[in-house]
Amino acid sequence: MQTLSAEEVLELKRRLARLLVEKSYREGDFVLASGRRSDYYFDCRVTALHAEGSWLIGTLFNHMLSEMDIKGVGGMTMGADPLVAATTVISHEQG
């Protein structure tokens, strides 16, 4: 498994943050699932389904999970599906 330095992790987080703002952040008039209104919205699925975003998420998740005794990853379908896929692909890649 690949070990990342603190500097590498910070750079990956910066890249992911930039991509989230570029791909997922929108300003406008939005009605949220709760019925409340907002003048901004993050649709993180757009970033999670983007090739670089998926790679960044998978790499960072694997880094965070590397010190834990984890046997699997999962979550609510739709939102978590791309995150789980990215995490498992990077996990396989890193052995």
Which stretches of residues belong to each language-model region?
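PRPP-associated nucleotide enzymes
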Residues: M1-G95
